[in-house]
């Protein structure tokens, strides 16, 4: 019952937003369709669907066509790509178990997988931060900087630590007499 009410509210909100911002809604729908197509095709380059999610985030951040448009697009693009790749990093094990698409699967057997993903995420967040710093943000600037410079890393650290612990536990169960 509760989820039915929630979904009806979402549909109503979506229709209202689509009516208010038809061009944005069209761009977002096209990007979602591209993500869906790339995922169904098993795209091995994680940046392809991540780029589409960056387009979605750009449209969310972009309120009007003014002098800050390009900077907002750069901020949103990097942030969206970061979110998509971080989500893939977090979901990799479960996606593998359930046979679902994950854009990082092709890279996951690399011995430096965690560092590889971390470097991608650092590069994306550096792009996001550089673009953000060009914006004339006054309200909540410190809060936003805190999120950009440290808050976004909380989830990555949690995921990486969980992966490292699992790897260590698996290694210990395979070699019970060995100390680490």
Positions of PLM-derived features:
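Active-site alpha-helical segments that house and flank conserved acidic catalytic motifs
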Residues: 7-8, 70-94
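Generic structural concept
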Residues: 32, 76-80, 122-125, 129
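Accessory, usually C-terminal, subdomains that scaffold auxiliary metal cofactors
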Residues: 92-158
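Nucleotide and nucleotide-moiety/phosphate-recognizing core
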Residues: 11, 20-21
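A structural signal for well-ordered alpha-helices, especially hydrophobic packing surfaces
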Residues: 61, 83-86, 132
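Single conserved hydrophobic/aromatic residue that forms the stacking wall/gate
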Residues: 1-6, 10-11
């Amino acid at each position: 019952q509760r989820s039915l009410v929630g979904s009806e509210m979402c549909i109503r909100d979506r229709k209202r937003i689509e009516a208010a911002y038809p061009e944005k809604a069209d761009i977002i729908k096209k990007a979602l369709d591209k993500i869906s197509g790339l995922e169904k095709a098993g795209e091995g380059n994680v940046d392809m669907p991540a780029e589409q999610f960056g387009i979605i985030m750009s449209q969310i951040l972009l309120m009007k066509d003014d002098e800050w448009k390009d900077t907002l697009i750069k901020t949103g693009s990097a942030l969206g790509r970061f979110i998509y790749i971080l989500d893939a990093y977090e979901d990799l094990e479960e996606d593998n178990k359930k046979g679902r698409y994950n854009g990082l699967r092709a890279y996951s057997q690399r011995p430096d997988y965690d560092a590889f993903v971390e470097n991608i995420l650092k590069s994306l967040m550096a792009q996001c931060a550089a673009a953000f710093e060009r914006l004339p943000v006054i309200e909540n600037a410190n809060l936003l900087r805190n999120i950009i410079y440290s808050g976004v890393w909380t989830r990555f650290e949690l995921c990486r630590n969980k992966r490292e612990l699992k790897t260590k536990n698996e290694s210990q169960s395979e070699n019970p007499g060995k100390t680490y």
